[in-house]
From Swiss-Prot:
Pfam families cross-referenced by the UniProt entry: SpoU_methylase
Keywords: Methyltransferase, S-adenosyl-L-methionine, Transferase
Coiled-coil intervals: none
Annotated binding of S-adenosyl-L-methionine, by residue: 44-46, 80, 100, 107-109
Family: Belongs to the class IV-like SAM-binding methyltransferase superfamily. RNA methyltransferase TrmH family.
Protein known as: Uncharacterized tRNA/rRNA methyltransferase LasT
Gene Ontology BP annotations: tRNA nucleoside ribose methylation
Amino acid sequence: VDSEAHLQPAARWVAHGAGEILDGVQTFATLEQALADVDFTVATTARSRARFHYYCTPPELLEQLSERKQWVGQAALVFGREDSGLTNEELALADLLTGVPMQADYPSLNLGQAVMVYCYQLASLMGVNAAPQEAAAPEGQLRALRHRADALLDALEVGDDQKLRDWLHQRLGALPQRDTAMLHTLLHDIEKKLAK
């Protein structure tokens, strides 16, 4: 996002045989543009933020993503800048937040270390699954649920309560697919009642 670091000669020196990754880089002006076609976004953070309360550890993230593997078409794991991480506005674009638990006064890994921890933890998701796959839920299901929930908050005239909206968005990101589908049904019923 808004970077040309992959074009620098030093990027090839440290890529160690992964030049095809650098060759396939897509760039975007903003994180929001980069996530436009992503169904489920996970953002990494080292700091506790007042607006965001639910975090999962890397093992918990593996569990969350494993459950979603059958119904999420495209997922993104977002890392922040080396020096300052992600902004609150960027974190707000995520469905789920994750962090590596650390015992230190300033709990932070450098970017390379954080990427290694998550690559190691999530490597099993890239394996070939020989088991028959369940029918996938429609892509964008979580995004549609968020829009419906936001519309309901507006209809109830509490849409300007940013704390409530942030909390709701974070909790929706943690729901398994079955609960997401059930909540769509519930919101549909509520919408019908409100329309009367």
